[in-house]
């Protein structure tokens, strides 16, 4: 089957922003103008195409990244609409991992918000080229150039407007295209009758100034253009377009557009810019991976290359389990068998679909650069690599943040116990930041996630999708443990009980690992002092001990263990003996490595009227917070601080009463930090049942 669109005419893009910037409305308009939907759906009416879960339509926020295919100007555009709420950071993270370009949507009134910075950092982590759409230009207080300034200052981006608004707030009547030097005047409410004319006389000076600014920014990304610009002071439309594209692909330039998705102004120009400036799969560096022999390798975006794809999302669906994949190379055909190289298991591709939100189109194959979904995969979970069994490779996986909050959950009726465990398994398969475990002492089921809203929505889904009513306990902080020193540890397990005995002996070196590295195991056994078949069980024993902690029962993170020595017995050694010896060696080493308790620190931003600034700062300090910055803008004070999550429960209610309901705040996970000794002692004694 031939390609419907050549690779250079494919765009895999994400639409990302902070909550309420109008991201889903922008996606809706893109689908309307490109012909996927024939009626405009509004988020506030609960009718948006990409918000297809019941909770999304009720709450007016996007929770899961819905993938939709559309086309514009002979280009295939695959769009992922991502959530703006910080509790759903993993959804943004996983979509960034598989995208080639991003439209960052900002509100013309609110500008750069804390969540915008998080999304920007995620795009930086995966080096995703991007452009900005400053939305809601029709709102009172809209200020395009102010937002452009914030993008430069707060996000440190080389942002250059390629448009200017004609009017603002209620008088927004059109948009100036600085590249073409033309005005687009909107003649009807649906934004379909557009008159392209010369720049209005009263804007000629402003347009000339910003056009020069754009030319300078573009020239800086290309030496040939710098020379021409310095000589003539001018760049042609073709040179500008080529220069902007080159700058975007090299991460040296961020074009800034404006409009109002809700009022149907500027969306077609956004689509034009996606086609003109954002990369095709062949414009971005080939995906990297690791071969079975440990060597690094790349897979080019090419149908003729060996097949490789990344599973970036798993969803329970009325028709079975849907696994969303990003195709990086080769062709994936319906009915074929492929290798899940992450888990070393074979998978059969029973059906392939391309999605249009909750509508789907069955296809016979997916090709390099495509986004689609597979039905019928058994073992594949988020972050796994699918590839050809003849050319195995494991692609770079997703970064998954540690959960920060946990609650105990139990079914309202004993009969629902089995349904509850099924629901929890299905939800954990979909969402890697959602963890389920059983408290060894109490036997309670504990669920952990990225925030209260995250867990609330998952509990809500249990009721709606799995018909399980559950009782939820009070939220608990997900503490972690780590080490601050290095040491050696030894574990010898020897048992003679008549007949065959048990023998395992392991020697390790333990040291602090890199931040966010979790548990890292290195095998340096030489000369066969411990046979190969006992290395994995030794590692498993250490890993299990790592997960149950040593100080207060919380998982140990960022620990590097090197197995350096040991011994075995021809008859008495077994996998179980080495698993126990590995665990003993781990416990022996860790107590000599200065273990400490860690707590999640949250990045908190509070906005209050100026009069309340003093009491807000005092209150944050009393919560063990470190105030990192404050700014006053039009009588509103903004305070940013790092505060332990343990001190932030109930803050929304406190803030309301302190500010007479006029304060707002946002909170997201920042990092883990050592718990002060006096606080740690209380937590440890409580966990050991001494309090």
Curated annotation (Swiss-Prot):
It is found in: Cytoplasm. InterPro entries: EFG_II (IPR041095), EFG_III (IPR009022), EFG_III/V (IPR035647), EFG_IV (IPR047872), EFG_V (IPR035649), EFG_V-like (IPR000640), EFTu-like_2 (IPR004161), G_TR_CS (IPR031157). One of its GO terms (cellular component) is cytoplasm. The keyword Nucleotide-binding applies. One of its GO terms (molecular function) is translation elongation factor activity. GTP binds at residues 17-24, 81-85, 135-138. Keywords: Cytoplasm, Elongation factor, GTP-binding, Nucleotide-binding, Protein biosynthesis. One of its GO terms (biological process) is ribosome disassembly. Pfam families: EFG_C (PF00679), EFG_III (PF14492), EFG_IV (PF03764), GTP_EFTU (PF00009), GTP_EFTU_D2 (PF03144). Signal peptide: none annotated. Its main location: cytoplasm. Residues 8-282 form the tr-type G domain. PANTHER family: RIBOSOME-RELEASING FACTOR 2, MITOCHONDRIAL (PTHR43261:SF1), TRANSLATION ELONGATION FACTOR G-RELATED (PTHR43261). Belongs to the TRAFAC class translation factor GTPase superfamily. Classic translation factor GTPase family. EF-G/EF-2 subfamily. Catalyzes the GTP-dependent ribosomal translocation step during translation elongation. During this step, the ribosome changes from the pre-translocational (PRE) to the post-translocational (POST) state as the newly formed A-site-bound peptidyl-tRNA and P-site-bound deacylated tRNA move to the P and E sites, respectively. Catalyzes the coordinated movement of the two tRNA molecules, the mRNA and conformational changes in the ribosome. This is Elongation factor G. The gene is fusA.
